[in-house]
């Protein structure tokens, strides 16, 4: 990578990110701006993918809300995310869990592991 680009991105990388992988259940505290005020909205779900590396790294979280699947994609190093909590670790054998979109109910459960 170009040394100039690398020096610019190093200052913007966050160090308070816990280690999590696809299959883990996370609680994301995201800042939401509504008009002139700002509040924190918690989005809890299963991580179904992690993409890229460095400053452009992203992850997708999926949850079921009122029987409808909702997915949100967040950049790892964004200041819009207050914090990320790992609720539990799941045992999966894939890097991308897009097959969970077709499953519902008990079939969409992920076995928990101790880490």
From Swiss-Prot:
Entries under Pfam families matching the protein: Ribosomal_L19
Name of this chain's protein: Large ribosomal subunit protein bL19
Gene3D superfamilies recorded: 2.30.30.790
PROSITE patterns assigned to the protein according to its UniProt record, in alphabetical order: RIBOSOMAL_L19
GO cellular component: cytosolic large ribosomal subunit
Domain of life of the organism encoding this protein: Bacteria
Entry-linked PANTHER family: LARGE RIBOSOMAL SUBUNIT PROTEIN BL19M, RIBOSOMAL PROTEIN L19
């Amino acid at each position: 990578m170009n040394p100039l680009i690398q020096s610019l991105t190093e200052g913007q990388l966050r160090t308070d990110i816990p280690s999590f992988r696809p299959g883990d259940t996370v609680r994301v505290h995201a800042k939401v701006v509504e008009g002139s005020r700002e509040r924190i909205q918690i989005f809890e779900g299963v991580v179904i993918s992690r993409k890229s590396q460095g400053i452009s790294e992203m992850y997708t979280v999926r949850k079921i809300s009122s029987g409808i699947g909702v997915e949100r994609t967040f950049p790892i190093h964004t200041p819009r995310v207050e914090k990320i909590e790992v609720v539990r670790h799941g045992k999966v054998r894939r890097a991308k869990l897009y097959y969970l979109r077709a499953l519902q109910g008990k079939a969409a459960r992920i076995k928990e592991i101790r880490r």
